[in-house]
Amino acid sequence: MENSKLSDRARGIDLIVYDFDGVMTDNRVVIFQDGAEAVVVNRADGLGVAHFRDLGIPQLILSTETNPVVKARAIKLRLEAITSCKDKKIALKSYCAQNGYDLNKVVYVGNDLNDLEVMKIVGFPVAPADADPKIKSVAKLITKSKGGEGVVKELSDYMMGS
């Protein structure tokens, strides 16, 4: 990605991919009597997403969840989302091939074991502070923020050299 506003860290990124639960949320869910679920997100992450969008960096949410809250948040953030994904590695490889993205130029933010294999194939794996230790072991960046506490905003600040 060529853009004069990009820092050296952000230059060359083809795509940023986020897991949802445990990255944009604190991994907790509220279940109502009717079975509906709700999560809490951090508005600062919305600022991080907007910053990357303003710089022209494509972004994607990739989740195994079937919960409609993931799609609702993606719509609010104006992000594409792949949900109900059985194998994130296969899904991301396919998505990148279809869209001409180089996996070596992909940033992937994940927190749990279902992110491990996909994090091994991207160029820049990122983990929240409270990620599973196996995830942290493959991450090139571990944020100071825990999941749901501004991980995406912190990544945005880091990529822009702030």
Q: Model-found features: residue ranges?
A:
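N-terminal active-site wall of soluble small-molecule enzyme domains
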Residues: 42-49, 66-71, 84-95, 113
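Short coil/turn segments at beta-strand junctions that form active-site/ligand-binding loops
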Residues: 12-14, 57, 104-105
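Non-catalytic pre-domain segments flanking phosphatase-related domains
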Residues: 1-20
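Acidic active-site catalytic centers that drive phospho-/nucleotidyl reactions
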Residues: 19-21, 45, 111-115
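Substrate-recognition element of Asp-dependent hydrolases with the DxDx(T/V) motif
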Residues: 23, 49-73, 82-83
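A positional/architectural concept
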Residues: 24-54, 64
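Mg2+-dependent phosphoryl-transfer enzymes with acidic/Ser/Thr/Gly-rich catalytic loops
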Residues: 35-39, 81-82, 89-162
